[in-house]
């Protein structure tokens, strides 16, 4: 499983946003 695709960046961004909203 390689994370060398734009999906990795998108998933990371989505995860950060989700955590930010969840921590609100």
Swiss-Prot record:
InterPro entries assigned to the protein according to its UniProt record, in alphabetical order: PQQ_synth_PqqA
Keyword Protein biosynthesis among UniProt keywords: no
GO biological process: pyrroloquinoline quinone biosynthetic process
Keywords associated with the record: PQQ biosynthesis
Pfam families: PqqA (PF08042)
Entry superkingdom: Bacteria
Keyword hit for Transport: no
Protein's pathway: Cofactor biosynthesis; pyrroloquinoline quinone biosynthesis
Annotated function: Required for coenzyme pyrroloquinoline quinone (PQQ) biosynthesis. PQQ is probably formed by cross-linking a specific glutamate to a specific tyrosine residue and excising these residues from the peptide.
Sequence similarity: Belongs to the PqqA family.
Listed name of the protein: Coenzyme PQQ synthesis protein A
Underlying gene: pqqA
């Amino acid at each position: 499983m390689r994370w060398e695709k734009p999906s990795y960046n998108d998933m990371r961004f989505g995860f950060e946003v989700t955590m930010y909203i969840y921590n609100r």
